[in-house]
Amino acid sequence: MFSPEPFAVMVAPSRTMFIVPPLPLHVIHYFGGVENLKGKKVAMTWAYSPSYGKPLSVPQGVIGLFTRFGMDVTLAHPEGYDVMPEVEEVARKNCEKYGSKFHKTNSMAEAFKDADIVYPKSWAPFAAMEERTKLYSAGDQAGIDALEKRLLAQNAEHKDWACTEEMMKLTKDGKALYMHCLPADITGLSCKEGEVDNSVFDRYIVPLYKEASYKPYIIAAMIFMSQVKDPVKVLMDLDAADSHRKLH
């Protein structure tokens, strides 16, 4: 059902994108093991933010990774907030290989319906990020300023895309696991209108910090794997040696 190697997407002959976030560790622990993830519904949804240009790594990581666990993944966003098509194709291929489901919708409520996990987070459209990269490469500050103004106006059209108490009631038994990579745009706390209601965020603050606590281990693992040719062998040798670190 699950392939253990890091998630990598060849997005073009000259660029490979690796996404290895702490997401799986958190949900594996929360649901009591990898074997309990199959069939769980995940709602990866766009959410309103008063800022623009947030990265695509989270939605792409979720649809690319969670479909490898046999999970039912729904990607929801307003028209025009598409992620990289190559990553969507990875998700579809994972469905064929691991018996997962991948669905797209322009309805946040549809995605939240009976979901076991919800991940409402803002991101910028992939096309806009491509445009911004070109403008920065050209040193076109006027173009960058115009793009920012346009994207902020685009975001403002979708303020109803927020993780509210009413939206959470649509989830499975009204108790889906709320996830966010942090920091979140919290309505009434960090901003006037944002990704999530203050009451929802506050209720999930403990699991949110547990999720964040896995990041150092993931970073260490990525550094280790980039420096060692055969990481599995090295780890097995260390385990077999049964040596203990000495404190001086």
Predicted segments, located by residue:
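Adenosine-phosphate binding glycine-rich loop
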Residues: T171-H248
